[in-house]
Amino acid sequence: MALKNFKPTSDGKRHQVAINYSELSNEGPERSLLAPLKRTGGRNNNGRMTVRHQGGGHKRRYRIIDFKRNKFDVPAKVARIEYDPNRTAFIALLHYADGEKSYILAPQRLQVGDTVVSAKTLDNVDVKPGNCMPLRVMPIGTIIHNVELKPGKGGQVARSAGNYIQLMGKEGKYAQLKMPSGEMRLVLLECMATVGMVSNPDNSNTKIGKAGRTRWMGKRPSVRGVVMNPVDHPHGGGEGRTSGGRHPVTPWGVPTKGKKTRSKTKASDRLIMRRRK
């Protein structure tokens, strides 16, 4: 999908680069697959802020996405490709042969009218974008997305716009996957994955253009610690402009900006063949 540039009719339009959504459906979403999305503003059940920089934004309804793809051997036709305000990727509405409807993440090159299917063997499914199958039946080198880490749990990785994972090899009961970060990881061969790359790869080339558009997305400003007072942040205070005077920390004094946060005893360490670069 192409990018769209704007004439500089205002400072907010001057540098804006947006996605051209002309190829997407302009019908409303499928009502049976919608759920309410309550806004929290970053507050918990006590009303206290637990996540900063959240609040405001346009009201949304959640689209129920089928990440498990466990309706096997029933072909489904792509009725339309839609915009989803809750994620960077586009979504595809499927009409199954038995009358059921569901949303899936739309892979690149999936078109309206295409047929997709989910299966356990290659007898009933081809290796083409949108089809879902276990890693054990996929050819080595296949580009995939929406990959499970535990069989039956549903896809957890490679779900955002333009992302993909490559199947590099198989050994024993594990598949060797090259993750979007460059990490090489072992995943059980029984885990399901969908063929293809996630749609909307140009999302990373967009420019928001103005602060107000970020507010429409529900994001509030992020204030630097060095411009706060000492009571508010460890970097605060000082006479005139200062650099903070110490290595970067969070408002609670925890090292940040490059400090490794992964647990040294994480069980999944044995499944990581090579760390990300």
From Swiss-Prot:
Residues 266-277 have a biased composition (Basic and acidic residues). Keywords: Ribonucleoprotein, Ribosomal protein, RNA-binding, rRNA-binding. One of its GO terms (molecular function) is transferase activity. Residues 227-277 are annotated as: Disordered. It holds the Pfam family Ribosomal_L2_C. The keyword Ion transport does not apply. InterPro entries: NA-bd_OB-fold, Rib_uL2_dom2, Ribosomal_uL2, Ribosomal_uL2_bac/org-type, Ribosomal_uL2_C, Ribosomal_uL2_CS, Ribosomal_uL2_dom3, Ribosomal_uL2_RNA-bd_dom. One of its GO terms (cellular component) is large ribosomal subunit. GO terms for biological process: cytoplasmic translation. Part of the 50S ribosomal subunit. Forms a bridge to the 30S subunit in the 70S ribosome. One of the primary rRNA binding proteins. Required for association of the 30S and 50S subunits to form the 70S ribosome, for tRNA binding and peptide bond formation. It has been suggested to have peptidyltransferase activity; this is somewhat controversial. Makes several contacts with the 16S rRNA in the 70S ribosome. PANTHER family: LARGE RIBOSOMAL SUBUNIT PROTEIN UL2M, RIBOSOMAL PROTEIN L2. Belongs to the universal ribosomal protein uL2 family. This is Large ribosomal subunit protein uL2. It comes from Magnetococcus marinus (strain ATCC BAA-1437 / JCM 17883 / MC-1).
